[in-house]
């Protein structure tokens, strides 16, 4: 059956089919060929789940996160808004169908900025959005969120006109994807579990990804070293041990023969995770005792551990392993691609190349649409100047004409924005206003002339310059 060709196969899918069938259909009331059911009902459901669960290669967002970004752009959310209220606004404006609680969690996730969360959060949280030690945020009615200062630098409003629009029951909703100035799917990472597919992408450094973009724009290709996973503030190590396989280690130092101090945990461990681990190790006789010196005010870990005598004789690497300070993660690069299809990428580099090519395509569209916009503005300013100047110089006499005759006169002189021109207030038909109109026209023509020199490379470079400036000192 063709369904297994695009949602995977195996015992997990057989169980999914069983659950779907008995949750959605009463056996005595519904009869259908198994192959028809699998190729239609189940396949549609599976694809919908996957589209909700997997990040998009272009903007790194799942469907719900994109709805939040869409509403933030639409509302120009520059002032903090209660998370519970923002969730309600997203539901109203983007046809979100899965309830407030789930959406509030999405908003919180977009704002979290501790080590192991977002390397570049899209929203700025006001209140307790969780920390690395204690990730649980406060209730949504007590915390607020707004756009980050660099939000519109990542999602340039000039690109909005070129986004692929979507509609639900006649209402416009979020676009299929955005084309941010940075590859957010690699910078912030992402996870997702769908039907027959899963995704696990680790975060990368913002600075490294900017370096990769700048070098790629210059035609340089040997950039694999910049795709190493990295989290802001992480003091441990990340070592490649296989294809897309990484060994993430915390930090441990000896304090005498049988004592060690742990000052960093491997991502994504939390304080609570490691406290449970230490109790298990103590019960198993691997360690004798431990004390917790972690500091919640600085979100830093500190554990002093007394080892069992036999454990103390081992090497540092063996002790690190026994104390669960080494975590192995294999990345799985499954994303929704630009064609809205599920695609399993082989590496972070392949994801970047797909993102880069589509982004360049949309920068060319930006140049075309901005050139068209500026040309229209020049045309409007030119007509305004010609009209006011004509009235001032007496070439266009308006005082003894009715509106219909005036419109005919303007048409004969090649004017097009007639309604706007005939609605100008009388005080604008003066010599000084004519000069102001000429100055505005000259400025706009110069702006258009300069913009005609732009290329996708120069536009992207300007975006990166602005983002780097906004991120300084962050």
State the predicted function of each range.
Residues 4-6, 18-25:
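Aromatic (phenylalanine/tyrosine) cluster motif
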Residues 21-243, 304:
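Catalytic phosphate-handling regions of large nucleic-acid enzymes and associated NTPases
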Residues 219-474:
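Charged, surface-exposed alpha-helical interface/stalk elements
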């Amino acid at each position: 059956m063709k369904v297994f060709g695009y949602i995977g196969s195996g015992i997990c899918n057989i169980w999914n089919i069983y659950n779907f069938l008995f949750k959605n259909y009463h056996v005595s009331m519904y009869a259908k060929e198994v192959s028809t059911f699998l190729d239609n009902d189940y396949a549609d459901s599976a694809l919908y789940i996957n589209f909700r669960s997997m990040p998009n290669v272009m903007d790194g967002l799942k469907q719900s996160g994109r709805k939040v970004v869409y509403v933030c752009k639409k509302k120009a959310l520059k002032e903090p808004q209660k998370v519970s209220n923002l969730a309600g606004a997203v539901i109203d404006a983007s046809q979100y169908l899965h309830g407030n609680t789930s959406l509030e969690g999405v908003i919180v996730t977009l704002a979290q900025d501790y080590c192991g969360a977002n390397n570049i959060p899209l929203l700025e949280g006001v209140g307790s959005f969780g920390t690395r030690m204690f990730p649980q945020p406060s209730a949504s009615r007590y915390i607020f969120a707004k756009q980050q200062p660099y939000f519109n630098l990542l999602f340039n409003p000039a690109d909005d006109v070129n986004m692929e629009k979507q509609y639900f029951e006649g209402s416009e909703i979020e676009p299929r994807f955005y084309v941010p100035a940075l590859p957010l799917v690699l910078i912030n990472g992402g996870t997702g579990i769908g039907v027959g597919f899963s995704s696990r992408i680790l975060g990368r450094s913002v600075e490294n990804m900017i370096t990769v973009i700048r070098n790629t724009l210059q035609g340089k290709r040997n950039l694999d070293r910049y795709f190493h996973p990295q989290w802001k503030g992480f003091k441990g190590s990340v070592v490649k041990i296989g294809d897309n396989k990484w060994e993430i280690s915390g930090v441990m130092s000896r304090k005498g023969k049988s004592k060690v101090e742990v000052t960093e945990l491997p991502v994504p461990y939390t304080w609570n995770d490691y406290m449970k681990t230490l109790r298990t190790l103590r019960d198993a006789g691997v360690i004798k005792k431990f004390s917790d010196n972690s500091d919640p005010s600085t979100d830093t870990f500190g554990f002093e551990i007394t080892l069992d005598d036999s454990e103390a004789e081992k090497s540092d690497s063996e002790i690190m392993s026994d104390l669960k300070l080494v975590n192995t993660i294999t990345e799985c690069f499954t994303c929704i691609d630009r064609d809205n299809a599920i695609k399993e990428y082989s590496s972070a580099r392949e994801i970047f190349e797909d993102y880069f090519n589509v982004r360049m395509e949309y920068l060319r569209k930006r140049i075309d649409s901005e050139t068209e916009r500026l040309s229209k503005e020049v045309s409007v300013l030119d007509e305004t100047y010609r009209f006011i100047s004509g009235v001032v110089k007496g070439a266009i006499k308006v005082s003894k004409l009715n509106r219909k005759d005036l419109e005919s006169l303007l048409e004969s002189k090649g004017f097009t924005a007639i309604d706007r021109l005939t609605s100008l207030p009388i005080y604008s038909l003066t010599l000084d206003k004519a000069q102001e109109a000429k100055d505005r026209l000259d400025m706009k023509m110069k702006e258009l002339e300069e913009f005609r020199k732009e290329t996708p490379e120069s536009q992207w470079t300007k975006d990166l310059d602005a983002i780097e400036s906004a991120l300084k000192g962050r």
